[in-house]
Amino acid sequence: GIKFSNDESFLKKSIDEAGICVLHAPLFHPAMKNVAPIRRELGVKTFFNMLGPMVNPSFPKNQMVGVFNLELQRLYGYLYQQTDKNYSIVHALDGYDEISLTGKTKVISNQSETMFSPENLGVSQIQQQEIFGGNTVDDAAKIFINVIDGKGTEAQNNVVCANAGLAISTSKQINHKEGFELAKESLLSGKAKQSLDKL
C-alpha cells in the first residue's frame, strides 16, 4: 500500500523521486474526519463531496476535477474562472465523474468548453461492463494492479489513459489527444509502474 503522510519533507521527497505524491484529505483537514461517519451514514453526496477539490492543500497550479453532474460542473467552471489555475472539469454524460469512454464527455477548461466522444481520441466507445470495478475493494485493487502492470484490457487501458491524458494536457497546455498518447506511452512502457513503485 501507499503510506499516507502530511509531512512536507516526505511529500516533497515523493515528488522528487516518483514524480507524484498522495495527499490524503483527512490528514490535511482533520475536522473532516468528524464529518466522515455522518457522510457515510447518509449514503448520499453532500456539500463536502463538492468542497474537496476546492480546498486542495497544495494549491495546485494545474487541476483536473471530475464532477457528478452538469450543474456542479457549471458551478465549478464559474469558481475556477476566478483563479489563475489551468483547469479541466470533467463530467461524462452517462453519470461518471471522470472520462468513461462509454459515451460523450463534457469538459470545461480555462481554454474552452467542449463535448467529446471516444472517437476524438482515436478509440472506440466501450460498454459499461468493460470497466466494471469489481464487487469488492480487493477486486478493484486487482484490476488496478493488472492495469498498472500492463495487463489491463484495451478498454481499461484506454479509460485510464483518457483520464491521465486530460490531466497531462491540462498541465502541459497541449491537446487531449497528445496527452492521451503520452499517458499511453507511460503506461505501456512501464514508466507509470516505476513511479508507483517509488512511492
Residue ranges and their predicted role:
Residues E8:
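Mg2+-dependent prenyl diphosphate-binding active-site environment of isoprenoid biosynthetic enzymes
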Residues G1-S5, K13-L199:
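Glycine-rich anion-binding loops and their surrounding alpha/beta cores
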